[in-house]
Amino acid sequence: MTFVESVRSAARRSGVDLPEAMIDACARHFALLGTWNRTHNLTRIVEPEEAARAHYLDCLMPLLDWPAPATFVDIGSGAGFPGLLAALAWPQARGTLIEPARKRASFLTLAVHALALDARVRVAGIVEQVELGDRVLSRATFPPGERAKLAGRVADEGEVVVWGHPHDLSTWEAEVATWGFRSLPARHYRVEGLEPRCLLRATRGTAT
C-alpha cells in the first residue's frame, strides 16, 4: 500500500476525512523525509502504513476540529511532528518550529519551503530567543524540570499542549500545579491501530 493509500485508509478507519490537499502535503513531506532519512536518521518509522498512523494521523487528528490559535510554537520539532502538521491543520496560524539539532533544522527549513509554508512558518534553533506563541506544542520527550523552565516563559493567556496518554492525566495535573498553572480538559482521540491518546493541556490564564 502506498503512503497516500495508507493515510486515506487509516483516516477513514479513524473516523476523519482529510482534504486531498492535506494528504498531498503529507505525501510530499513523507517523500522528503524518506530521502533525508537515508543519511541523517530523522526517524525510525519509515514504513508507509506505520508512518501514516504513528506520525501523520497522530499529529493531525486532535488538531483538525480545534479552533486555530493566532500563533504556535513547536518545541523539539525534529522531523516536523507535530509542528509542520499543525501548520497544515491550522492554515491561518503563524508557527515557529524550534529544533536545536542543525541537521534536523536544515531538514525543517527545506520542508517548510517544499510545502510552501515560508510566509507563515519559520525555523529556530534556540528556544530562549523565541517569543512563545498562543499555543506551545510538544510531542518530544522532556524531563519535567525542562518543561517547568519552558512554562515560565509562556504568556499569561498562553497554553502548553503535550502529546500523551490518558494514564498521564493525574501526573500531568500534579506537574502543572508546580508551575503555577492549571490543567485544561484533555483532547482525547484514537488513531486506528494505536492506543488511545490525548493532548495534555495547561494554562496559567483564564482560557478554557
Regions found by a protein language model. Give the residues of each.
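Hydrophobic packing within well-folded, soluble alpha/beta domains
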Residues: 72-75, 86
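Class I SAM-dependent methyltransferase "Motif I" SAM/SAH-binding loop
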Residues: 76-80
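Short, charge-rich binding segments
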Residues: 65-66, 87-89
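S-adenosylmethionine
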Residues: 81-85, 92-96, 100-208
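Class I SAM-dependent transferase core
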Residues: 1-69, 73, 103-117
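Hydrophobic alpha-helical segments in the ANL/AMP-binding
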Residues: 59, 84-87
